[in-house]
């Protein structure tokens, strides 16, 4: 993998208690979006989803950290989902739950107030679809990479390899 975040999450998962544990970890967008199907990152995400450990992802406001303005995500991972959460992943849009700081601290210009925290926690605990919460079956996040190739054409002829199969363009 090109990003160690998912490797670290694998390590945390390996430390979960068999009777049930919950992990909360903040990531940038990289663990969500990097890696082609069949690649390292994609395979780790697949492993987490197939084992039904990913419970919730909360998209946090940007500009929450001192040294960067990037958007971050709170992942909640557990090996003991409640029956209503089994086979499902909740996505919470927490980007509007912040208060602006009077004075920026580097790139940090926003913070989540206690009231904002309670709104996000309420969305998590209610586990209902609404304007900030989506609930999807685990299979919603599975995909297969498909590559469509065109044959290599030179001077109007399809070029073939030694086996007689068309060479890809």
What is the meaning of each model-derived region?
Residues 1-169:
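A conserved structural/catalytic subdomain of Rossmann-like adenosyl-cofactor enzymes
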């Amino acid at each position: 993998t090109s990003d160690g975040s998912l490797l670290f999450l694998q390590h945390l998962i390996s430390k979960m208690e068999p009777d049930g544990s919950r992990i909360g970890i903040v990531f940038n967008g990289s663990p969500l979006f990097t890696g082609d199907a069949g690649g390292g990152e994609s395979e780790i995400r697949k492993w987490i989803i197939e084992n039904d450990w990913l419970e919730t992802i909360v998209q946090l406001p940007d500009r929450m950290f001192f040294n960067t303005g990037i958007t971050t995500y709170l992942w909640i991972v557990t090996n003991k989902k409640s029956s209503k959460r089994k086979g499902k992943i909740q996505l919470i849009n927490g980007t509007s739950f912040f208060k602006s700081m009077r004075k920026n601290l580097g790139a940090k210009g926003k913070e989540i107030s206690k009231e904002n925290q309670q709104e996000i926690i309420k969305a998590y605990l209610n586990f209902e679809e609404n304007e900030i919460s989506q609930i999807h079956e685990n299979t919603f996040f599975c995909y297969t990479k498909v590559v469509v190739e065109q044959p290599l054409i030179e001077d109007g002829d399809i070029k073939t390899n030694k086996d007689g199969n068309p060479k890809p363009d």
